[in-house]
Amino acid sequence: MTTDMRTRIRAGDPDAFAELYDQCARSVYNHAFRLTADWSVAEDVMSATFMEAWRRRASIEADGGSLRPWLLGIATNVSRSHYRSNRRYRAAAGAAATAGVAEVADHAEETAGRVDDRRRIAATLTALGSLRRPEREVLVLCLWEGLEYADAARALGIPVGTVRSRLSRARGRLRKLAEVELARKRRELTPSNRQITGDRDFVIRSAQEGNR
């Protein structure tokens, strides 16, 4: 982002701000969804983020690179407010993790692999919702959004060393939680498989008896 554009936004130029929106809206929206696990809430967070950014435009430094880290920091704070006011977050995270799964072609090995990948992704997203908020924020900014440690630190208002330590803890906890969640999902599938087998045996037996 050029210094001229920063200056224009600081001065309240609506065209420059509209350009900023076009450049960063999708990134802000995706970031909000990863933090809230709710598409509708993510839309609200995105809107509130840009409203807050406009209100705080005078705080933009004249020199610097992209304003994306600044916007993601605002979005993180807006998402925190939502998290504090919404105690149903974890249920939403679990629902979002399994929603919108696309159908795949019926090719045995490929389908089995994709189903397992889907389960792992769902388990990871559910585990993400179980992380402590500070750990989740750092993980989303650094791993999903791809911010450098320094940019993530500025976005969150914390030291770079804190970003590093939180990210290290978050990675370890996410890995363990995801494995536990994946194992739980697999255990839940077992009774269903037994029921399918039982229903099949019942139908075949009934058909055989009917032919006697």
Positions of the model-derived regions?
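N-terminal module of bacterial RNA polymerase sigma factors
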Residues: 1-27, 204-212
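C-terminal edge and immediately downstream basic/flexible tail or linker adjoining helix-turn-helix-like DNA-binding
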Residues: 8, 95, 154-155, 172-212
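Short, charged helix-capping/linker segments at alpha-helix termini
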Residues: 8-19, 29-48, 59-63
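Arg/Lys-rich amphipathic alpha helix in sigma70-family domain 2
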Residues: 55-62, 73-94, 109, 117, ...
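A short pre-motif secondary-structure segment
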Residues: 138-142
